[in-house]
């Protein structure tokens, strides 16, 4: 169970002003300081700083979101003049270290998950986002604009070792297919990709570079270049991602 503690004043019968609010959980307390006013006009101007929190000490609903282990730290400033939280201006940063995460639409855990995220009102900046999945390592730097509506995501992806069958299906569907479907249906993504060592079935490719565009149910990998034991690789790959069906791709 959880309780909320608060301190404040009632300067007049029609309003309440709080200057400290704390969410008290069985093993951790999350404090917020500043001003929160109800009644005679709404106002929030508060700072939340958690310190380092161990994921197992947090509520069960967080584990249900897929995060199973790691350490989280959050520092946010929240300002607003309307009760609707979607209108509030949120700035600050969030960090995750040593994370273990299960993401809907991806087969297998994301391991050694590290993230440092800078938050602004309509923009989220992933300063660092790295993890390992099924023997591959991925590091991402990206900016997400318009994240409250249809996100526009730009940035770069780097990998020392990547199994390309995570993206290009060997059978009917890839291990991250459902996740890609969701992204392609809800977002617009443009990412530069650099892979030191890539593999697909029996093909090994070095110094692989490409640009990925994802939108409107389609994954478009262009400006594709690399070196294999059979020579130079170049081309473009367009993958249609119909929900719950095999991918249709042109090479």
Task: Identify the role of each PLM range.
Residues 1-5, 9-17, 28-124, 136-222, ...:
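Membrane-proximal interfacial segments on either side of biological membranes
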């Amino acid at each position: 169970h959880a309780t909320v503690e608060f301190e404040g004043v009632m300067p007049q019968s029609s309003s309440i002003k709080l200057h400290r609010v704390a969410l008290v959980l069985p093993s951790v307390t999350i404090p917020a300081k500043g001003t929160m006013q109800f009644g005679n006009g709404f106002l929030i101007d508060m700072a939340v700083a958690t310190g380092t929190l161990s994921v197992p000490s947090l509520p069960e609903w967080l584990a249900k979101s897929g995060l199973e282990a790691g350490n989280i730290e959050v520092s946010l400033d929240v300002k607003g003049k309307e009760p609707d939280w979607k209108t509030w201006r949120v700035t600050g940063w969030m960090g995750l270290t040593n994370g273990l995460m299960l993401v809907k639409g991806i087969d297998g855990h994301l391991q050694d998950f590290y993230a440092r995220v800078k938050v602004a009102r309509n923009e989220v900046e992933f300063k660092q986002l790295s993890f390992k999945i099924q023997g591959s390592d991925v590091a991402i730097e990206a900016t997400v604009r318009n994240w409250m509506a249809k996100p526009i995501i730009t940035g770069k992806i780097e990998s020392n070792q990547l199994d390309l069958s995570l993206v290009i299906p060997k059978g009917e569907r890839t291990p991250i297919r459902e996740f890609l479907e969701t992204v392609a249906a809800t977002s617009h993504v443009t990412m530069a990709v650099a892979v030191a060592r890539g593999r697909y079935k029996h093909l090994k490719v070095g110094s692989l570079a490409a640009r990925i565009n994802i939108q409107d149910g389609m994954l478009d990998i262009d400006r594709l270049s690399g070196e294999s034991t059979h020579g130079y690789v170049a081309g473009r790959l367009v993958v249609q991602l119909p929900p719950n069906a095999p991918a249709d791709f042109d090479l």
